[in-house]
Amino acid sequence: MANHPIDQELTSPAEEELTPREIVAKLDEHIISQKNAKKAVAIALRNRTRRKKLDPEMREEIYPKNIIMIGPTGVGKTEIARRLSKLCGAPFLKVEATKYTEVGYVGRDVESMIRDLAVISMNLVKQEFRTKVEETAKQKAEEALLDILLPFPGENKHGSGQITGFATSSTLADEEDRKTHFLETREFMRKKLKTGKLDDQEVELDLPNPSVSQVPMLQVFGAGNLDDLDNQLQNVLGDILPKKNKKRKLKIPEALKALEESEAEKLLDPDKVQREALRRVEEMGIIFLDEIDKIAGREGKSGADVSREGVQRDLLPIVEGATVNTKIGPVKTDHILFIAAGAFHMTKPSDLIPELQGRFPIRVELEKLSREDFEKILTAPRSSLTRQYEALLSTDGIQLEFSLDGIQEIARIAYDMNEKHENIGARRLNTILERLLEEVSFEGPDLPESQRKVRIDGKYVTDRLQGVIQNKDLSQYIL
């Protein structure tokens, strides 16, 4: 289409051909330990790249090998899947298996996860497209705003808000002189606009009303198994109901932003975006199914176990390959990668129904984090916890410095607390660091300049946490 500056097919910016070793190396930048889990997801991602190179007939026959990650909370299960999706620019959805109910019961049915993934895919593609047309949209928005501020005689398409004091009409007799004077004035206005000298001015824009996302009379359909019917009815009514423009008074910076969004929307090719969103969700979608152990049954089934088995049976066709109607069209789930995870303390993977077990052929056990792992988590990742706190407090002029013995002491306390109480993995570090830095976070902005350099060494950590650690009741609830 000639109106759209980008005519080539949209492709994910991160769809590069990384080898499994390179994928693991990139995951290592953010996640400590868990080599086996990283290898499993790296192979799964690489197999997608391999599959794309095959002829269509063979491509259709190759399905993703879904993965079950087994390990306690806080060891990196979710983070591995999340980082993997970012690495390949894939639509990613994390859901909890316990949130779904068997068909016929009140609650969300399992197909809703595919509908949610489709919406994520559409938003992802739209954002990528907007990034590509950002400069064009900015230029068009600037011209549109100048048209409002200083319209050609008799013209004002978007709204009103002319700034007076400029001769733009019959005061100049000659047409050419009038045009030259107008263009000079327009450039003068452009400079004022770019330098922010017009930021206090208000303009009235005639902008399209956002599409109605919910029709009140249909909200009764917004839950449970009627999600799909609700979506279809809203889509139909959205097309039938007239779209009206709405006049809004905005300051110049806000008006410019609103016009940029409006112009970007005009540059967007809805059919192309929808096609790419559909392709992306079907070929690259990743669903992280957490707490799958909670829907695993046990021997001697009670009523609750029977209900859990119902969810498993509803989940089976989605994982196996089905077609689900969504807002962007029918989505085939055959090639969506499912990564399930669970602690499996009270159950084991073999407690899942055999048919579902067969759809998750790869099983990876994640290791419990050691004291050395905690030390690495605090320092090695690109956005490690210590770097995050250093960056946050630097905005108040506080210079945090973590010494080696300070890091070791924090890691030791985290490991010991996990051993003595509930093992929450790396999340224990968050609670400890919050407690440790509570005082400096609160007092920091008011500290004199001479006290704004804070060194977190072993003694600092011990002094602030020893009392809490020694008090068993306190440590259980605070750390």
UniProtKB/Swiss-Prot annotation:
Pfam families reported for this sequence: AAA_2 (PF07724), AAA_5 (PF07728)
A biological-process GO annotation: proteolysis involved in protein catabolic process
Gene3D superfamilies on file: 1.10.8.60, P-loop containing nucleotide triphosphate hydrolases (3.40.50.300)
InterPro entries per record: AAA+_ATPase, ATP-dep_Clp_protease_ClpX, ATPase_AAA_core, ATPase_dyneun-rel_AAA, Clp_ATPase_C, HslU, P-loop_NTPase
Family label: Belongs to the ClpX chaperone family. HslU subfamily.
Matches recorded under NCBIfam families: hslU (TIGR00390), PRK05201.1 (NF003544)
Role description: ATPase subunit of a proteasome-like degradation complex; this subunit has chaperone activity. The binding of ATP and its subsequent hydrolysis by HslU are essential for unfolding of protein substrates subsequently hydrolyzed by HslV. HslU recognizes the N-terminal part of its protein substrates and unfolds these before they are guided to HslV for hydrolysis.
Subunit structure: A double ring-shaped homohexamer of HslV is capped on each side by a ring-shaped HslU homohexamer. The assembly of the HslU/HslV complex is dependent on binding of ATP.
The protein's name in its UniProt record: ATP-dependent protease ATPase subunit HslU
Species of the source: Leptospira interrogans serogroup Icterohaemorrhagiae serovar copenhageni (strain Fiocruz L1-130)
